[in-house]
Amino acid sequence: MIQRLWASRLLRHRKAQLLLVNLLTFGLEVCLAAGITYVPPLLLEVGVEEKFMTMVLGIGPVLGLVSVPLLGSASDQWRGRYGRRRPFIWALSLGVLLSLFLIPRAGWLAGLLYPDTRPLELALLILGVGLLDFCGQVCFTPLEALLSDLFRDPDHCRQAFSVYAFMISLGGCLGYLLPAIDWDTSVLAPYLGTQEECLFGLLTLIFLICMAATLFVTEEAVLGPPEPAEGLLVSAVSRRCCPCHVGLAFRNLGTLFPRLQQLCCRMPRTLRRLFVAELCSWMALMTFTLFYTDFVGEGLYQGVPRAEPGTEARRHYDEGIRMGSLGLFLQCAISLVFSLVMDRLVQKFGTRSVYLASVMTFPVAAAATCLSHSVVVVTASAALTGFTFSALQILPYTLASLYHREKQVFLPKYRGDAGGSSGEDSQTTSFLPGPKPGALFPNGHVGSGSSGILAPPPALCGASACDVSMRVVVGEPPEARVVTGRGICLDLAILDSAFLLSQVAPSLFMGSIVQLSHSVTAYMVSAAGLGLVAIYFATQVVFDKNDLAKYSV
């Protein structure tokens, strides 16, 4: 009895709760990083053309871009014995587990269900890839909200999101490293099977352990009636499942895109310049990262993904995939190192110099990847892009914090600004309140004057207490919908959306470009070209007050 009481107190300790929540963060990033590395070659092996393979990779980001605001609002309104966040975390985690089961066993399941296995195998594989990308990326939103609920004190919040960012980086390193191992010759091969089955079996085991940790997380009880709807959520009438109310809710969902368009069109020029620069930079980097392993396997090692297993061409391709995974692992490791020293770099050289240097570094690394046939040079170039990756995680959000801290200077035509705050929720909130200088944002980024540890940006921030000014209540009449002032969380959400949009564009066009050029080197050439475009827009970013007159903002 005493031991059980001691264990219960230990699990309820603040640091124990912090570790339990961030274990799932680690598990999610391991699965996503391994999926980015291994899924494109797997799609090519089963016969998916380059053009359609890249489109498949865009399914998850597109769905995430639309659904994250809805999920954030629904989580804020949820009432249940397991809290507001964990039911959504568990539901999305089940989607990740289902994808980890489907991807390596698509052919086997297709053979059980239908005589002509190829069409069904492709459908199951695409379903698994879409589930992994969608559920994995969207699950970060309720995880961040849970951290914010549990650690509401400012000092504790900064510590919580620092650990959150570190666990994401650590998970990325492991996720990129696992596909680089030849599991066919490992001691696990007799028990787990082929390379794919071993890899995804380990991912499933890691994710199950991390998911089980959330069972011991103690969420705060949410008392009282549901708070007024904020963001995008279904009103109380729809909870009765009345068909007319449900239909009204779905019809009113069509107001989402006009509202988003209105908010984006009203974006201040300083933020618009920053958004365009970040979007171009992310497009260049994601084009490089998404297709790097396929480039190494086909272009550098001269392998053939559709060759029969055991042949020389297939063996070369598999070796290239493992070497490509090692390059992405080094990219993540270098980005982690630069994230740790980013504060010192900014203090010594300034934000402008560090940001421009990081953007200029990328096309140089991508060009070296295109021109060189040396495995060492190509791998070193991939590692060098970690500097760009780190800077894009931190500096744009530092600049956004600067803009909002000095609104009268940087945002003089801030229409509808109601003072920059909407008040904090009386109940637990989904995200941190407005960031302070040197404080970590809820997505792991840092405010001005500090640097954080690498954390991939989430898709969009859902309903929160941090000055979100997009109030569209589904189910209310149009005249009841109002938009108050813009807050920093909305503008951070728009900046964060650049990350998902940067995955959608390459997914739509890169496959066709490669088919027309008949060379996977087109991946790296396109990345280098986008990097050059990003340099131009990076030079147009407003870094200080002197730039306002220089660019006539």
From Swiss-Prot:
Transmembrane intervals: 19-39, 52-72, 88-108, 120-140, 161-181, 198-218, 275-295, 323-343, 353-373, 382-402, 522-542
Record key words, sorted: Membrane, Symport, Transmembrane, Transmembrane helix, Transport
Name this polypeptide is given: Solute carrier family 45 member 3
Organism: Mus musculus (Mouse)
Catalytic activity: sucrose(out) + H(+)(out) = sucrose(in) + H(+)(in)
Role played: Proton-associated sucrose transporter. May be able to transport also glucose and fructose.
Subcellular location: Membrane
pH dependence of this protein's activity: Optimum pH is 6.5.
